[in-house]
Amino acid sequence: PTPTRSNAAFLGWHTNQGREMVTNGTAMKSSYGHTLVAYWDTTGHSITKTDSYRNNFRDVPSSAWYYDNVAAVYEYGLMNGTESDEFSPNDQVSMAQTVTLAARLRKLYLTGDGTFASSSPWYQSYLDYALSQGILDAAPADMNAKLTRQEFASILANALPDSALLEINNVPDGSIPDVYRSDTGIYRLYRAGILSGYDDQGTFRPNSPITRAEVAAILVRMADPNSRILFDLG
């Protein structure tokens, strides 16, 4: 059954990986003897779908692995097409696009409205918001630069508050094979189930480029806690 709690939204059941992680949770025993934790959003914030996807993009076939993710980010108002009928799933993302996505994600979460005023250059209003909200510490030197997976994840990790990125996975420091312990943003996203890596060891490939299709998958997990991935690297 779906539990209820006063002034909180149910985010889903998760295993507690043998740890005490119930600050925002309610523990119970399942019929199989496992401890489950009900996670709650007690902030009153969430991201909801405000549009309908009707196969808008001709380069997103229904058989593609990213189809559902592209449809979802369009419905959330997080991503649009590169053209009216194209999504360009294999294109890399730039710094300006990444800042825009992070700003839009945070504003949608906090206010329910992801719109920004027009500006020149086009990304300026998003950049100003990202700086004011602590998503970025300083303005990037090159807003047109194409980002690596590490660069993208480090920015997205700051887009939502801690209360929206609860730890559901056991990912000890140093357990991601190709990520430094100091890359706390990436570890934060692994622990929250936003990222999981390419294999059972959690390999991240931080220096590889990141595509719009991959970005869509990450944004869906940021927006919808029930879509996050459970795993254990301990």
For the regions a protein language model found, what residue spans apply to each?
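Secondary-structure capping and domain/repeat boundary segments
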Residues: P1-S62, D68-A71, T184
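Feature responds to low-complexity, polar/acidic, surface-exposed segments characteristic
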Residues: T42-W65, N80-Q150, L156-G185, L195-P209, ...
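Aromatic- and glycine-enriched pocket-lining scaffold segments that form the walls
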Residues: I218
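PEST-like intrinsically disordered low-complexity regions enriched in serine, proline, threonine
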Residues: A72-V73, A130, L189
